[in-house]
């Protein structure tokens, strides 16, 4: 027979013994006896097979108490909410009917093929600064998004407020500050407080008919670009992306897990953990996945780390590699969409264990250069055309076939679909299923044909209590989950088993023995071995015998008679 608890946290026997409600004698480290770990019971509760009903009830009460704690812990830790975020906005517009000042005002009546370039960003300072005040062109290399010989105008459309910006790309300060972009005209700079900004760019061509435009393949770009803190100059202020940096991608904040220069893939993931793990630590990622830091080894000045990724207790992936600020350890497990970066390792003063600065991500996406992440939208990286140290005159270029780590300033999606040769008022071109490029003639007003970016987007985000996410340029923190919003969580309920079903020699977990030597065979075994002392005169007692159950600790809950055992059980329940 088995006596099961009715419910399903991490809890230790607390020092609530001081309540004084129940008088009980403590032997050993009673307060340190852990009964729940990570939502699961750590001990079997054992009652004698010939025990009186009172002892069986005591065991069931202990099991039920542990079970109720599991239920509360699980409910609090597992409570989450799915939120829907909706955002809509429009950028400034450019009236193509009065865009020019070089003798003719109407762009749409220029010779067919003449081009106009427009840009918007999460903050207008970035879009404004992309237009070169001296040349009138954008700071973009020729034939990347437009043909400079055909360009009639380059215009900033200010901000599209629903685009996203990450204000601190290196929240844990993994990388040391170098000279800031504003101070020197070289690529050798880095700012821990840098920003990453979403931008939209498009080139349209005149059809010389006064009412329609053409949008060519390769003429529209969505981009997420890293900048020096509060400096919006693309030529001087952009900074190279590094593993662990945060950046927005299609309205959500991601961490850069890996720039894979072998397969030319950019891996991005959503942060689960960013902090320090100690050698031997195991971190619960969720969905049955755990990351274990198996070992951190030092040879000279070099550190190597051994990691294991487990699913339901079984190792599904492992990595052993060196780690440093210039060579982070990266581990990606594609079946579980999990990405891990270890940026730095060190030892404690006594040199007997190590630590690793670790980022764990989930929902990892793989952006392969030259491939369509979304139909008609190809993955590119944002680069500069100047590869020497001097970048003061550098311009934006795009790469769709090769990742160059020291020349990657952002990631983008470039339009590679069919040419749109009849783009007119009332039509919209969807940009990466995220934003739109629109034309509006204000009800056929002869002097109006406004070109602008817009967004009307809805995204869902699932958050645990206390978690923060950035969605569509909104920071959202879930402070709590109300009871009626929580779904039931399944746990393995603790069971009271009989002393004939478990032995001290073969136990695979801790044991809680309810009943004295007369009522419980395992308690008698401990008494006969001299590990506890208990007679018919013994008071209510809680005694911990370290390692007595096949190396696992044993907690004896007993007394000299049934009443004393019940009192000991009630004292334990009071302390939990």
From Swiss-Prot:
Glycosylation sites: 102, 132
Location in or out of the cell: Secreted, Cell wall, S-layer
Signal peptide positions (record): 1-23
Post-translational modification summary for this protein: N-linked glycans consist of the 779 Da trisaccharide beta-ManNAc(Thr)-(1-4)-beta-GlcNAc3NAcA-(1-3)-beta-GlcNAc.
Major place of residence: secreted
Alphabetized InterPro entries for the sequence: S_layer_C, S_layer_central, S_layer_MJ
Biological process according to GO: cell wall organization
GO cellular component entries: extracellular region; S-layer
Residue ranges that the Swiss-Prot or TrEMBL entry lists as coiled coil: none
Keywords for the protein's UniProt record, in alphabetical order: Cell wall, Cell wall biogenesis/degradation, Glycoprotein, S-layer, Secreted, Signal
Record-linked Pfam families: S_layer_C (PF05124), S_layer_N (PF05123)
Family, per entry: Belongs to the Mj S-layer protein family.
Known role: S-layer protein. The S-layer is a paracrystalline mono-layered assembly of proteins which coat the surface of the cell.
Name of the protein: S-layer protein
Origin organism lineage: Archaea, Methanobacteriati, Methanobacteriota, Methanomada group, Methanococci
Gene: sla
